C-alpha cells in the first residue's frame, strides 16, 4: 500500500508556486518526510532556488527539464515526473509528501490523476481582480485555490472582496484561501488544508479557508 501523497502545485509564472513550496517545506519538514519535484522547460532554476532557500537537503529536491510544453509533462505524458517520483520513493521509502511543481503555465493547467493525488493552484492579486472570474480548470477544479500577494491589492487597484465573490462563484463550494507569502500570512491555513484533506488528519477546517 502506497504511504505517500503527491501534491501537484500549478499556476501562472510568478504567482508564487515555488515560494509556496519553499515556505511550506520550511514549516513542515520537521514534522513530515517531504520531497519536491520541480518542472522547468530548459533549466533547473526552481530546484536550485529551493535547494538554496528551503530547509530540505539537496537530495530531497529534484528538477525535471521538460524540454517542451510544461502542460504535457504533467498531463498527457507524465512519464518523466512519474519516474522522478519513483526515484524519490526509492531514495526515501518513508516519504509522506511529494510536492510536484509544474512549469510556468496558464489558467488551463491540470495534472494527470496518475501524477497528483490532490492539486493546489496558485494565482496572484497582481494579475488583477478579474483573474478568478476568468475561470479555467486550475481555478474551478483544483482541490485548493491559493490567491497570493494580497498585500499588492492597493497598488494594482484590486478589490479582494470582488475576488472572493468571484472565486466563490467559480469554485462552487471548493475551498480557496488568500495569502501573503512574503509574510507567511495564512500559510498555516494551507498547512491545515494539507493535513486535513491530503493527509486525512482528523482536524477542523482552518479558519482562513473560504468556501
UniProtKB/Swiss-Prot annotation:
Subcellular localization: Cytoplasm
GO biological process annotation, one example: urea catabolic process
> What's in the keyword line of the UniProt record?
Chaperone, Cytoplasm, GTP-binding, Nickel insertion, Nucleotide-binding
SUPFAM superfamilies from the UniProt entry: P-loop containing nucleoside triphosphate hydrolases
Primary location recorded for the protein, binned into one broad class: cytoplasm
User: What function does the entry list?
Assistant: Facilitates the functional incorporation of the urease nickel metallocenter. This process requires GTP hydrolysis, probably effectuated by UreG.
| UniProt protein name | Urease accessory protein UreG
Organism from which the protein derives:
Actinobacillus pleuropneumoniae
Amino acid at each position: 500500500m502506497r504511504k505517500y501523497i503527491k501534491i501537484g502545485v500549478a499556476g501562472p509564472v510568478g504567482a508564487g508556486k515555488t515560494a509556496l513550496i519553499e515556505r511550506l517545506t520550511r514549516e513542515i519538514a520537521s514534522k513530515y518526510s517531504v520531497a519536491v519535484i520541480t518542472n522547468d522547460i530548459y533549466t533547473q532554476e526552481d530546484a536550485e532556488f529551493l535547494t538554496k532557500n528551503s530547509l530540505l537537503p539537496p537530495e530531497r529536491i529534484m528538477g525535471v527539464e521538460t524540454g517542451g510544453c510544461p502542460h504535457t509533462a504533467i498531463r498527457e505524458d507524465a512519464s518523466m515526473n512519474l519516474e522522478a517520483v519513483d526515484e524519490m520513493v526509492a531514495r526515501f521509502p518513508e516519504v509522506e509528501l511529494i510536492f510536484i511543481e509544474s512549469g510556468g503555465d496558464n489558467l488551463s493547467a491540470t495534472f494527470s490523476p496518475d501524477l497528483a493525488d490532490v492539486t493546489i493552484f496558485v494565482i496572484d492579486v497582481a494579475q488583477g481582480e478579474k483573474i478568478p472570474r476568468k475561470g479555467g480548470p486550475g481555478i474551478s477544479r483544483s482541490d485548493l485555490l491559493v490567491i497570493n500577494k494580497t498585500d499588492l491589492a492597493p497598488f494594482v487597484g484590486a478589490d479582494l472582496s470582488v475576488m472572493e465573490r468571484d472565486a466563490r462563484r467559480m469554485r462552487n463550494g471548493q475551498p480557496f484561501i488568500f495569502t501573503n507569502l512574503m509574510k507567511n500570512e495564512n500559510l498555516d491555513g494551507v498547512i491545515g488544508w494539507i493535513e486535513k484533506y491530503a493527509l486525512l488528519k482528523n482536524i477542523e477546517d482552518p479558519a482562513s479557508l473560504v468556501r
